[in-house]
Amino acid sequence: MEQGRPRSSLSLASSASTVSSLSSLSTKKPTRAVHKVHAFGKRNNALRRDPNLPVHIRGWLHKQDSSGLRLWKRRWFVLSGHCLFYYKDSREESVLGSVLLPSYSVRPDGPGAPRGRRFTFTAEHPGMRTYVLAADTLEDLRGWLRALGRASRAEGEDCGLPRSPARPRPGEGPGGPGGPPEVNRREEGRISESPEVARLSRGLGRHETHTPNSTVDLQTDTWSRRTRSPELFSPLSRPPSPLSLPRPRSAPARRPPLSAGDISFPARPHTPLSRIDVRPPLDWGPQRQTLSRPPIPRRGPSSEAGGERPPRSPQPRTPEQRTQSTQATSGSSTYLQLPPRPPGTQASMILLPGPPVDSALHQSLETDTLLTKLCGQDRLLRQLQEDLDKRQEEKEQLEAALELTRQQLGQATREAAASGKAWGRQRLLQDRLVNVRAALCHLAQERERVWDTYSGLEQDLGTLRETLEYLLHLGSPQDRACAQQHLWMVEDTLAGLGGPQKQPPHTDPKSPSPAPQGEESSERESLSESLELSSPQSPEVDWSRPSGGDRALSSPQSGVGSPRVSRASSPECRQPSSPLLRTKVDHL
């Protein structure tokens, strides 16, 4: 009696999401029971993969066994349509198993889950088997969670509505010959809804381009029609993007059965109900080009059997028309039910530059910073100039001491012991002179570098003063008061510095290598020792001296006994006393 009943389109559509992928195998072997439909299919019992469906994501995952030692096995997983297949390797030759994802809950495991691996997630269904998978990296985990979550949520929402376009062909599906009796018993409970649902099915079937074989084909065909217009498409049929984890969303409420008076056809017939077109993310452009070509549209058997007019192909429309039609059919409340988009894909949420900073505060900070740098460079220039003066005085003292040593060597050629000490003293003075000249070279280069920086700061300060003077004459009253205050600040700073610095003379001392600054104290000690050895009070100096030698050593004109040698007196000290002494020094 059950076999003679007319098959209801609602009963066929309710089971099409689970068994329609086995339509090609229904003539060879009986279909499994309804309560086994969502079970994990292995090897020969796995679902047949449709090569025309696009692949949303594929890659390596680790699957945990459901029994035994619960070992982890590495498998190649492919998400095609709304079905998850896995293979032994990436060649995808033979399917090891398949999982149909409608109504599955995909969630990541917490940090305290005793899984033994990182980046694990779980796919579970109430009253059915739970699958535990693990990714290699965090990016892979995000991509898989987003893809599987979208697939399961998209199918779960469509399950609450009548799937009249997904009507099985005659002789196929669970309602045909050899189908399970439980499906037929469910048809008896829904037979009262058949007229309304059939009328709705005929109305929606007029606008469909073709009738897919299964709910997976229906979802993919709808998605392929959306991809023809790159401006707008559905967020539920969008391919996954591994940018962020899927956001949780509450389960859709089951709607009451539609009546004949409530049936209204939307402005866009081929758009599924409760689905809103939104703008695609920026990162999905290159990924969409890699998808396979959608199947060629064909006329479904429903339109041929009913004798209705041929389907119309969707006409291209502008984004404004799409938005207006969507708002007219769905209402403003539908937009409130949409989940928030991930942060990485919010094309409309662009950070705009904030309001400009207060000009007075910015100008005050700029003036203060410029004056601070100028004072620092001025202090550094003065310190370098002092160091240069000290080194120059020390160099002149060493040159004067060397000149006296040469005179003493020319007079003490007869005594070998005294001559050896004089030669050692002369060598020490020469080394100190080389180090002082090297330090002079280093200080001169540093002064030139600091002077270049100081000149640049002076130019910036001049430009700033011109700007302040311009604001003082032509600015607003508030700007005038601020400019006057900054001008006073600049004038006070320049007055404290003593006016602009003068450019130092260019010095190019010849030096073999720069000397470190730490040797200054040792050089001064060596110089004092050498000067004490060359003084007349030293008991070691016993060679003969020319007449007036004591006066030459003690007189302030010689520059050796005085603590400070002037630059004017140094040329006189460097000249030998007579041409005969100069000849003897050259001979030595």
UniProtKB/Swiss-Prot annotation:
Q: Does the keyword Heme apply?
A: no
Q: Where is the composition biased (Basic and acidic residues)?
A: 183-193
**PH domain span:** 54-153
Q: Which SUPFAM superfamilies match?
A: PH domain-like (SSF50729)
Q: Where is the composition biased (Low complexity)?
A: 246-260, 321-334
> What's the protein's topology in the membrane?
Peripheral membrane protein
Q: Which UniProt keywords apply?
A: Cytoplasm, Lipid-binding, Membrane, Phosphoprotein
Predominant location category: cytoplasm
Where are the Phosphoserine residues found in this chain? S164, S562
Q: Name one GO molecular function term.
A: lipid binding
Protein name, UniProt field: Pleckstrin homology domain-containing family A member 4
Q: Which gene encodes it?
A: Plekha4
